[in-house]
UniProtKB/Swiss-Prot annotation:
It comes from Rattus norvegicus (Rat). GO terms for cellular component: nucleus. PANTHER family: COILED-COIL DOMAIN-CONTAINING PROTEIN 174 (PTHR15885:SF1). Residues 430-453 have a biased composition (Low complexity). Its main location: nucleus. It comes from the Eukaryota. Residues 64-98, 276-317 form a coiled coil. Residues 410-419 have a biased composition (Polar residues). The keyword Coiled coil applies. This is Coiled-coil domain-containing protein 174. The modification Phosphoserine is found at residue 206.
Length: 474
């Protein structure tokens, strides 16, 4: 879809200026092209561009640069002067050390005696030269003396040795396995040769090391010769089974500790196998004996443990019967057992059985005292006052709010019911709730009547009486 062209508001003068500028640029381009073709290069164009903000310098930069240049020139001058002064001083010191003074008066101006220093230096040089000459002379004398001693020893060894009285003491020269020339008495020669032979056996080069000194053709030839010898030996032997050692042929693989290299000879191989079988049987027999001994020891130990368990069970049974008799308040004699009639099942439902357990490391009836509590005073008494008396003595200011006791009115029916405990004495039946009582003492002191058909019970008027009673018992 073609869009309509918007009319441009351009004056005639601007169009004429644009056309003139275009014509001028075309003429300039033609002139540059003609100059380039003719080999004449025109002047570079001068760009009248506006300088950017980065090309501008800060104020005072040029003045500071001039000051820095002047300061550097001054520093360079002072450096040159100081260098000249130092060079003059070095030359003067060199002359003084050599003794070249301009005047004796000038020499007295300095604190250092350069003349004495020159004399001392010359003396040191003379001493060093003398010591060096003496050391060189001593070394020469020592070398000459050593040479004379060697000559004397040779002359003594060759001329002054007396002739041997016995032929076995005659000195003999021989060459050992390492190619060294040796001298010894004739009587020591056999032992030395034997030692040399042993040493040569130790220094035997293995075939693996010899291979590195051979070429490939020589190695193949040696392998072929070895194979031919083995085949000849195999042809001489009778036909039989082939073993691993027959085909191993210098195998480089290490087969471990459990591998045993049997001999290739049949008789020797059978002998080795019999020996190994005998050793295996001895090992199995010893292992079986050791296992039997372990089983016997284990059986003896189990028997001992069973006896100990039986003894502990007997002791626990006896202790259990004694504890039951203490809980019931009756001391039974094991020699004269008496049959006690069992209570009816209806009475058991309303009884509470109490089992008193005491420590075995303490006496019955006596509380256990720890090691760190011995010698201390303790009171093992019971509360002598009831809860009602304690509440009466309490200051009403510290009493709890009255609404806490609203829900306790329902417990009246429970408190009216009598509480009973088996095994109590009949003397405890008539005690009232308002009096302080000790039912545990009466319970343990008064035995149960044998003629009664069932065990007497203890009745409690209130819940507090029952709780205090069980606190005293336990």
């Amino acid at each position: 879809m073609d869009r309509k062209k918007k009319p441009l508001d351009v004056t005639a003068s601007s169009l004429v200026d644009l056309k003139a500028e275009l014509f001028r640029k075309q003429e300039e381009f033609k002139q540059e092209k003609l100059l380039k073709d003719s080999g004449v290069f025109g002047k570079p164009k001068t760009s009248n561009k506006k300088p950017s903000i980065w090309s501008k310098q800060n104020a005072g930069v040029s003045s500071r640069a001039e000051k820095d240049a002047e300061q550097k020139l001054e520093e360079q001058k002072t450096l040159d002067k100081s260098r000249e002064k130092l060079e003059e001083k070095a030359k003067l010191y060199e002359k003084m050390t050599k003794g070249d003074f301009l005047d004796e008066e000038v020499e007295d101006m300095y604190l250092v005696d350069f003349t004495q220093k020159i004399i001392d230096k010359r003396k040191e040089m003379e001493v060093l030269g003398a010591t060096r000459d003496s050391r060189i002379k001593e070394e020469r004398d020592a070398a000459v003396a050593a040479a004379n001693d060697d000559d004397d020893e040779e002359e003594f060894s060759e001329k002054d040795i007396p002739p041997p009285q016995d032929p076995s003491e005659e000195w003999v020269d021989y060459v050992d396995s390492l190619g060294r020339s040796r001298r010894c008495m004739r009587k020591d020669l056999p032992s030395l040769l034997e030692m040399d032979k042993n040493l040569q056996g130790r220094l035997f080069v293995s075939p693996a090391n010899e291979k590195t000194l051979l070429s490939e053709d020589m190695r193949k030839e040696l392998q072929r010769q070895q194979w031919e010898e083995e085949e000849r030996e195999a042809l001489k032997k009778p036909m039989g089974p082939i073993h691993y050692e027959d085909i191993r042929e210098n195998e480089a693989r290490q087969l471990g500790v459990g591998y045993f290299a049997f001999a290739r000879d049949k008789e020797l191989r059978n002998k080795q196998m019999k020996t190994l079988e005998m050793l295996r049987e001895q090992t199995t027999d010893q292992r079986i004996k050791r296992e039997n001994i372990k089983e016997k020891r284990k059986a003896i130990l189990e028997a001992r443990l069973a006896k100990l368990r039986q003894k502990k069970m007997k002791k626990s049974k006896v202790d259990g019967t004694e504890e039951e008799s203490r809980a019931d308040g009756v001391v039974t004699e094991p020699s004269e057992p008496k049959s006690v009639p069992a209570p009816p099942p209806v009475a058991q439902s309303s009884k509470v059985e109490v089992i008193i357990q005491e420590r075995k490391d303490s006496k019955p009836g006596v509380p256990h005292i720890r090691e760190w509590d011995r010698g201390k005073d303790f009171s093992f008494g019971f509360w002598s006052k009831k809860q009602s008396e304690l509440r009466a003595e309490r200051d009403p200011e510290f009493a709890p709010p009255s609404n806490y006791f609203v829900g306790q009115k329902r417990t009246g029916s429970l408190s009216s019911q009598p509480w009973s405990r088996p095994g109590a004495a009949p003397s405890d039946l008539g005690h009232s709730s308002g009096q302080s009582q000790e039912p545990s003492s009466s319970h343990t002191s008064t035995p149960a009547s044998e003629s009664s058909p069932q065990a007497p019970t203890v009745t409690f008027q209130t819940l507090d009486d029952m709780i205090s009673y069980y606190k005293q018992v336990t």
